[in-house]
Amino acid sequence: NEFWKRTAKFWMKLFGINFAIGVATGLILEFEFGTNWSNYSWFVGDIFGAPLAIEGILAFFMEATFIAVMFFGWEKVSKRFHLASTWLTGLGATISAWWILVANAWMQHPVGMEFNPDTVRNEMVDFWAVATSPVAVNKFFHTVLSGWVLGGVFVVGIGCWYLLKKRNREFALASIKIGAIFGLVASLLSVWTGDGSGYQIAQTQPMKLAAVEGLYEGGTNVGLVGIGMLNPEKKTYNDGKEPFLFRIEIPSMLSFLAERDANAYVPGITNIIEGGYQQKDGTIALSAAEKIERGKTAIGALAAYRAAKSAGNEEDAQVAYKVLQENIPYFGYGYIKDVNQLVPNVPLNFYAFRVMVILGGYFILFFIVVLFFIYKKDLSKMRWMHWVALLTIPLAYIAGQAGWVVAECGRQPWAIRDLLPTSAAISKLDVGSVQTTFFIFLFLFTVMLIAEIGIMIRAIKKGPEV
């Protein structure tokens, strides 16, 4: 069918432009681990490097091979092989996302490793625990589905641009229909994965959950803040100021989402810092001050172990090793100087989360309205809807970035939760060097972004092949 062939070629061209930029920026990102994050690379390179290596060897080469056939194989290979190459390109991109998100999830919830005091490195002991972590699985589905939502919004928006310009009507309506159906399904599924993300955060990163909700004092039957404004004067968890100027809550909803029990206890920022509450495993939560002391003990025990080993004193080495093993879960806390460092930026996380959720709800409504107009009305005549669709494109990018703000800023101060704070993960570089390279890459990435947008606009203006 020539119509669908032209349609596929057009969207393939836009995909290829984004793919090229993704490869260019991704390669630069790989080098950053050695240049800017050398302590991190040494401390956990044995674990973090494995999924990235698999991503590069398996997924990237798979994409690179079959994308060439997908683009240049028209009329040169059989239709079945070309179709298979197209699907394998998409599969390769999905596998690539899996291993990248496995690495990211491990930073948020480190599992499957042991600390080796002889090398001062964490070493992998259970690959499958890392690769199939519940945090990784949920993060993968939520991230990929969010990407599909963005793709659906993009296709609908560009299709509406053609309708606005009164061009390629048949192509535009067919693309809009597919984009809206695909986007709606992905949007609805992302609600489910988003709920799973909230549950996983509650189990593994309670401080992030508390920051996202602006929850300072926990309790049972905790409500979910639907609408609220934080008090800008509240600077620390214990300054006595009210956290909100106003808020509207859904009663008991946070307890239900976090623990699947409306009566469950959810700790707040103050509770996590001060400790003393009963955790799900029945143990009493340690205070942040106690964790910091145990972290310092672990760091001291590591130094004592290495000194004893160097001196050939096995007895002292074993004593130090035992102390280290008892306190290793708190190793990263030894680098924390003030308990307030353990609290993420509450306003940033609180508002970013709500931007993501509100836009996610808007996308569901948007796709439903678009499909209604396609099947029940004449969408090609609704200019106001064309403008709405165009303006929705940047909102999809904003929603995705808001989600990553919560994911990455919500876990601060940790590069690896409880094991390595961000401040200790960096390379020993002077400020001037970091600033110089930052602005160089900022300039390069800005140029690449401008080039990408320019090339895409030209391709869109040209339209599908006639």
For each predicted feature, which ranges?
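Polytopic transmembrane helical bundles with strong interfacial aromatic enrichment
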Residues: 1-466
